[in-house]
Amino acid sequence: MIENENHSLRDRVSDLEKKVHEQNDEIMCLRSTLADVLRRLSTVEGASRVSNSHSIGRATPTKEAGIRLRHQNNDIRDSSKRASSYVPGRSTSTSHISRRGAHYQSTSSLYSDGHSSSSVSPAPSPSPTHAQAHTPTVHHHHHHAPSPTAHHHHARHTTLASPARSGPVGALNKRWASTSDFATPSRVGHAHSPTPTNSQLARRPNSGSLHNLTTLRSATSQLNLGRHGAREAQYNPDEGVVKLYLRGRPLNLYVPTALQETYSPTASTAHPPAKLKLEWVYGYRGRDCRNNVYQLPTGEIVYFVAAVVVLYNVEDQMQRHYLGHTDDIKSLAVHPNKLLIATGQTAGHDRRDARPHIRVWDSVSLNTLHIIGISDIERSVACLAFSKADGGSLLVAVDEAPDHNMSVWDWSRGERGYKMLETKCSADQVLAVDFSPVDRSTIITCGKNHISFWSYESGMLAKRMGIFENRERPKYVTSISFTDAGNVISGDSNGNLLIWQRGGNTVSKMVRGAHDGPVFSIYVQKDGAIITGGKDGRIVEWDRELERTGNIIEVPEQYGSPRVVTSGRGSQLVVGTTRNCVLEGTFTFPMRPVMQGHTEELWALTPHPGHHQFLTAGYDRICYLWDTMAHTIVWSKDIGEHAQSAAFSSNGEIVIIGTTSGRWFVMDAETREMYSQHQDGNEPIQVLKFSPNGQYLSVGSRDNNIYVYQVSEDCRKYTRIGRCQGHASFVTHLDWSADSQFLQSNSGDYELLYWNAGLCRQIVQTSQMRDVEWASNSCTLTFATLGIWPEGADGTDVNTCAKANNSGLLATGDDFGKVKLFSSPACHQKARCLEYGGHSSHVTSVGFLHDDSRLITTGGRDTAVMQWVVSPTSPSASQR
């Protein structure tokens, strides 16, 4: 009876939560409608004031109009009611609605033949079918896209104001009928055939199938892509200027003279003449995850980083990738048959579109078999395990939410599985969960202040806490495993190992000081030998009785401590470490890294100007030079400071590293010798750019200034020419002109300024710069990048962009983990693009290799570096 009442209570609470979410959406609609009315009233008044002297296309809100509006607060509600009484027109979305959707891929979409990536070729964004407008040919030499700091991009803003459009008062005849207007794909052109939203699907546990998830993902993807374009852009053909509004702030973008007569912001654009395919992922998530490295019968090591599961064949030097997840993967479990894999993810940026869930998939075909827990998991899947005694018919998962709920699933029943049991696991953090290999009904969990022994019978879970008796109780039980007899072995934060007798909850044996610090991993081999890994950097072998065999591996400090230890090929061990490395080795032969990665937030990226190499640097103080052909690290160097930006000299012999302290280093790109260091202010060096002729270096700082240096002595000597002052906020991006005379720069308050580099003076007559040819296009706010901005963008969504050297492509990275590929220049609204997932954090930098054969992207907090092959498409495909 109590259980039924609790179940009914949970259902009622769930219904109330749904209503609250819906009401929040309605409130957002009302706020947006109100802002829309204010903006449109301002536009109408501005248009009437200048109608006798200017065309209506140039009408913008005036300061006086804004002042008058502030005195009309009493009329706001009436205006809002009038606006909402009309027939619904095209809805205006807010920035949070255009965030990434829940990309639940179908089983077929994840198929990968051979060793190729499972990266899915995305559907191109819809666009009108008009002829493509003529665009000029642009030559460029640099492709590094400096990025702003994390603080700027972590602050999220919701754009409530709709665009200021000129036109009759009838333009006000628009409203939102309900919250569904925000999420349905009707704006794409199917107003009379709405499709369920991801959030609606997630709220209906029994609605639909994998096919429905696929259809939904496709519709949502097309919707998001169709929204591309600066919705508030207005074109004045008389002056040849496009006015773009970001968070209500106008930005004038001047159209090149050759395009003024034929340019239209809404003209149709071609698909990019190439597509991307994920080739290689550098990195591994071991710093804060456990039990996430395994050897498969295919000879591949499986692990994850960001939103990608990597299947890496070390011997053949090939990677495959499972790309079904939409945000950070936090847990991984391998089925007893060694072919099926379950992975769990965290909640995404938009909780409705990227809800935490578990995916069960085939490691051979990369087909998704089941999607579990979409409406049941609150925060993220902290740990996972398949049952062993019954051949893996059950799956247990622990939620990372405050209650740390544990749920047991019959995962193969239906496409969404069947939840058999759920209970609160612990008030404290849970670090691991596992089934007994001999007792189907026994589950063990461990974590902060506890080890718990669970048994389930007749639909009930019974819990017994581990009893330490007179032994020291550890603060954390950090790892668990089972002997072949079913006894539990646990490791704790005190460095002790304990054996718990099968069926009991008391300690039968204890080994003190097995490690100097926490025991992170316990692995029992087929012959009964036990291998442990600890924070002390040691891997120790024990016999069945927990007596040392004398075999010890000391993992070098540079690789970190062993986070997980498992069996590899033959007698080899595979080790995942706390410094995001994957190692292979034996007790006889030393450990060697098969994968290394950054350990902290990553911002600096610069491709080599002449080789298939690129350099990355991050807040972990480490610089890596990577080889894209061998997929290896050429060299690494600890610079001793948090790195923010980097740039290769034109000849590739020198690399400049900018730090968060305002210091930047001059380093030999081959020997790693430090030639000199310089200090420009005390704020982070956001951007570093060499001029095309190699004679100047521009340094963009968070102190709002751009410092210009004369370069001499083969790029080893730097003499400051001056400082460009004029930005009201920190510098985010820089570009040199092709003739090395001018600079263009963006700032944190959405400015686009131009500079005479030799004089360090601002060029106030910006219209004079409309025909300047730019060597690169890393500035995100320019005429050539007008089309990269989604509707409702708040100016911080797009972090980075880079123009290809010779292939007419433009790549961008945004706050939602998406990499997008456009045709260059992307100077029209609703510019068509191809969108790719994989990163789970904001994409901080993108850059093409010197021959445009590959695109390199870096994630911020996900610390991942991804390498994409750029493959040309047929002309007919790019024109469709």
Name each model-derived stretch.
Residues A202-R880:
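WD40-repeat beta-propeller superdomains and closely related acidic/aromatic-rich repeat-like regions
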Residues I2, N6-L9, V13-L16, V20-Q23, ...:
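Non-transmembrane coiled-coil alpha-helices
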